[in-house]
Amino acid sequence: QEVRDSLLSDPQIARVREEWTDLTVALVGIGSVEPSALLVSSGNTLPDRDLRALAEHGAVGDVCLNFFDAEGAHVESDLVGRTLGIDEATLKAIPRRIGVAGGARKHAAIRAALVGGWCDVLITDAHTAEELLRPQGT
């Protein structure tokens, strides 16, 4: 928290954060709470305790470290106090939010991101698009 607060007080970072409110388009990745084998092997993943806590709260995915459940509803996390990034309200105020993701491992996260309004345009692969068009439970 202390490091985060120090960074937030930096004029360069403050200026970047102010620019977020002027964005008209955002290109974002849609992440799954369960990290891929590649991310795990590279060490580029959240600590296990954070992943467990997110799973316990029903999180299935994230956009810009804003975690959400299967219905797309925001899932509170103490990561907010330890990370820097665009918050839900600022992100959702951007008129065009383009999500990029694909693969079977991310189907639940992608569906939730669309349902929750985290993105309004999706770039994905054909298999994922077909899966998303199927009624759930079939």
Tell where the protein language model's regions lie, with residue ranges:
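Conserved phosphate- and dinucleotide-binding cores of soluble alpha/beta proteins
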Residues: 1-138
